[in-house]
A protein has these predicted regions:
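A short helix-loop-beta submotif of the ANL/AMP-binding
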Residues: 55, 61-81, 85-89, 97-103, ...
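Conserved AMP-binding A3 loop
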Residues: 30-32, 171-199, 203-207
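Conserved AMP-binding/adenylate-forming core of the ANL superfamily
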Residues: 10, 18-63, 67, 71, ...
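Structural core segment of the AMP-binding/adenylate-forming
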Residues: 47-48, 75-151
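Adenylate-forming
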Residues: 61, 106-115, 133, 231, ...
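Conserved pre-ATP/AMP-binding loop-to-beta segment of ANL
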Residues: 153-175, 182, 217-226
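Flexible, low-complexity linker/hinge segments
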Residues: 1, 135-170
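Conserved AMP-binding/adenylation subdomain of ANL enzymes
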Residues: 194-230, 234-274
Length: 280
């Protein structure tokens, strides 16, 4: 039984491909659409030389692209690094260097900060940019627009042939917030974080779920719950809520910015069942 994050997500994708997986504003992605784009993103990383256990930074607010990238990174056998979008250049430089980051996904509005630190980070060679309506120049350091990267990648799920068997011992990395010093990377085995934070334990009984198909079987047998994590994806709570929803064939609603009135409208309009909220 391979309790690997990529496998667990793929089981749900296979069980409920036409169900809505992610909503952000007016954009919706089904599980099948998420799968295709995540496969493309994973292949793009692999084609650019990203190898197993390489670190890929996610420097974005909550949006569909960050979920595509999260899933694509684990499909590629790499490790995502959560990057606080409030960090200034010194903090970014430290985090990128400390994590040995080789690739980065960032929103366009952060291009000047990225341009300032890249010359000191020779390992960081691949930069993918998510359009956000800003006009900062990312071509100066070789950035590639997110949709262009997806267009270059294969949509196939052929990672077993490319990378070999996945393992429950693969690493999931969560960087702390850095409020009392520089952030620290906390390493989890995939199986452990699934059991503790990502829904792999029955909350009512405290018992581990039966097998890696338990959540996807439940997904196929039941209508979806709609989850709405409010904190930014840099926070472990929102990552946890998102992975739990993906594994269980449920729907995740995301919003890039917090606005109290908009949150209540979203809860009403999207018929949200479960709200995740932390101090930010």
């Amino acid at each position: 039984m391979a309790l690997n994050i990529a496998d667990l997500a793929e089981h749900a994708i296979d069980a409920v491909p036409d169900r809505v997986a992610v909503i952000c504003g007016d954009e919706e992605l089904t599980f099948a659409e998420l799968e295709e784009r995540a496969n493309r993103f994973a292949h793009y990383l692999i084609d650019r030389g990203v190898k197993k256990d390489d670190k890929v930074g996610l420097y974005c607010r909550n949006r569909t692209e960050i979920v595509i990238a999260m899933l694509g990174i684990v499909k590629a056998g790499a490790i995502a690094v959560n990057v606080n979008f409030r960090y200034v250049e010194a903090e970014l430089r430290y985090l990128f260097d400390n994590s040995d980051m080789v690739a980065l996904v960032h929103e366009r509005q952060y291009a000047d900060r990225v341009a300032a630190v890249l010359p000191e980070l020779p390992k960081l060679k691949t930069v993918i940019v998510v359009e956000d309506g800003s006009d900062l120049d990312y071509r100066r350091y070789g950035g590639v627009e997110f949709t262009e990267a997806l267009a270059e990648g294969s949509p196939e799920r052929d990672f077993a042939q490319l990378l070999g068997e996945r393992s429950p011992d693969d690493i999931y990395l969560l960087y702390t917030g850095g409020t009392t010093g520089f952030p620290k990377g906390v390493m989890w085995r995939h199986e452990d974080i699934y059991r503790v934070l990502f829904g792999g334990t029955d909350f009512a009984t405290g018992q581990p779920l039966a097998d890696e198909y338990d959540l996807s079987r439940q997904a196929a047998a039941n209508p979806p719950m709609v989850r709405y994590p409010i904190p930014p994806m840099i926070h472990g709570a929102t990552q946890s809520a998102t992975w739990m929803a993906l594994f269980a064939g449920q729907t995740t609603v995301l919003t890039p910015e917090f606005d109290a009135a908009a949150v209540w409208r979203t809860i009403h309009d999207r018929k949200v069942n479960l709200l995740f909220f932390t101090g930010d």
